[in-house]
Amino acid sequence: MVKTALEEFAFLIPLLPALAFAITFFFGRKMPSGGAIVPILAIAASFVISFAITLGLLANPEEVISQSYSWFAVLNIGILIDPLAAVMLSMVSFVSLLIHIYAVSYMSHDAGKARYFAETALFTAAMLSLVLSDNILQLFVSWELVGLCSYLLIGFWFEKPSAAAAAKKAFLTTRIGDVMFLTGIIVLTSDLLKVSGGFQDGVYLLRFDEIFSYIPELAALQINILGFEISHLTIITLLFFGGAVGKSGQFPLHVWLPDAMEGPTTVSALIHAATMVTAGVYLVARTFPMFIAAPDSLMVVAYFGGFTALFAGTMGIVMNDLKRVLAFSTISQLGYMMLGLGLGTAIGLEAVGISLFHLINHAFFKALLFLCAGSVIHAVGTQDMRELGGVGKVMPITAATMTIAALALAGFGIPGTSIGTSGFMSKDPIIEAAYLFGEHSSNWIPYVFSILAALLTSIYIFRLIFMTFTGKPRSNYHGHESPAIMTIPLSILAIFALAFGALTRTGFMEFLEETFTNSFVNLDIGALAGIGENELVAAAGHEPLAVLWPPVIVALAGFAIAFVIYYLRAFSLGPLASMKNPIYRLLYNRYYQHQIYTEFFSIGIVYGIIAFLTQVVDVIIDSVVEGIGIVTVFVGEELRKIQTGVVQTYATALIAGVSLLIILVKLIMEVL
């Protein structure tokens, strides 16, 4: 393709925030506002470049930006910007920019604000680098850096034991997924070497275009497990999905995400909207050609996603902490995204479009929800909804924008029209695709999961709105509206939460699908779907109104339930919402997963392994130390015998040693 100025600047997208990290880390303490201006300007520049590239690709989707620098056949650093990467780059940089601007005021009184802005700049750089990667190994390196940054930011207030514990929990839990992801890369590399005939000059096998070109050969490799022939490609994609389960908070590795609320609220917004948790969804979307040739893996993705969406919703309806409700909503919405990708067995490439479209829209209204929560906490000083009430009277802008975000999360709109919130435009197509899958395969489980999750979503988000902003204050707080530097980002995000979906729906999803139709030469998604024997539904996108209305009806039902109970207070839940109720207690304690993981896995298994290894290591170390002591004494005694004090003896030993060295050198030279 013709080189453009934008292509030459593409490498600056992650580099500028990385440089901002270095500058802020070393000099931020001496600068106003902790050096916040440095990452803000850097991320703004990254957004401008990203958005300009996205506009260029909208005009010519096949004109991808691809730059690759190889070191022999084993290492490669490259940039790949196709429609999928372009929209992610624009979203990550834009949302991160607004969060950084908001944080100038939110973190203004924090003594560690310079460290905060340095770490958030690095966090953004790591995510941008992950999205830009043109090969799976480079993506994994950025993936690990994202995990490290989340650890640092969740534990930002490390002097608090709860924050330090939450950071360690997030780091260790996501490591389980990371090990699976790395194992998948190792298996993939081994298989690629097998089917390609080994390393070749000028060819880097782990580039995505190279991986995709060998999918038929990878699918042909089989392994017999308990009498079942399983494709190597199925194993690889399941391992990749295991990595995504950890990063994107899917069941059963979701337990770290609610505790991640221990960091500053702006960190929560960054993790839940623009960086950490979207990485897993992006991984599955980026490697989608591999998944569509392994339909069993896609079905696993669909089931886990659908179940997670419902499972998280059951816990969200009983939480009283403002941020924890939003955390469970994130887990649930990520489940929808995974469900959308998993439905690729039925709707093919459209799965990437509907899932990533929801990811982008979710980033806007989820960032808005968290920043509004931060605005309330910043002004009132508490995040317990039982102590709030009436906040809308003193914080009208925050209340209005958070209500807009709630409408988007619940998916309010008019079916069959272009009238609706961004969440309606992106979440409902996933539910509709689940319906088509059920109609086509008689498997209604994903649809049931998704429709029930939609009901719970509406209940818990409007429960939050009514408990926080309506009624009378339930404590002696003295609230006030946040300053303009905080409310302006809220207003901008509210506009996107309302209108982005309606303005971009059809064209945006078609643009995303261009990733695998025009961006990769010789990539035939139809042929790969045939390898997996997928039976694609031709009716996708043309559903009757009877299919379009149920998601909206359950959203209205959820609103009505929350309105009657928490706004009108027509009746009290009484003992139903108390710890005396075993079901409530089960949900409030999150199904006791933390206790199970801690006591069974951590204490029972891990401590047992540690105790065993400790004994083994102690024996080895003791033996080695004692052995070294014995050998040292023995060698010392023997060497003492040749220390005669006679100069002639020393001269003879020196000549003999030099002669031996000369002989060895000559022998080596002859061999070479």
Swiss-Prot record:
Bilayer-spanning residue ranges: 8-28, 37-57, 79-99, 136-156, 179-199, 225-245, 265-285, 298-318, 337-357, 360-380, 394-414, 447-467, 483-503, 545-565, 601-621, 652-672
Assembly description: The FPO complex is composed of at least 13 different subunits. FpoA, FpoH, FpoJ, FpoK, FpoL, FpoM and FpoN proteins constitute the membrane sector of the complex.
Protein name: F(420)H(2) dehydrogenase subunit L
Record field: catalytic activity: methanophenazine + reduced coenzyme F420-(gamma-L-Glu)(n) = dihydromethanophenazine + oxidized coenzyme F420-(gamma-L-Glu)(n) + H(+)
Organism: Methanosarcina mazei (strain ATCC BAA-159 / DSM 3647 / Goe1 / Go1 / JCM 11833 / OCM 88) (Methanosarcina frisia)
GO molecular function: Methanosarcina-phenazine hydrogenase activity; NADH dehydrogenase (ubiquinone) activity; reduced coenzyme F420 dehydrogenase activity
Subcellular location: Cell membrane
Description of pH dependence: Optimum pH is 8.5.
GO biological process, one term: methanogenesis
Similarity comment: family membership: Belongs to the complex I subunit 5 family.
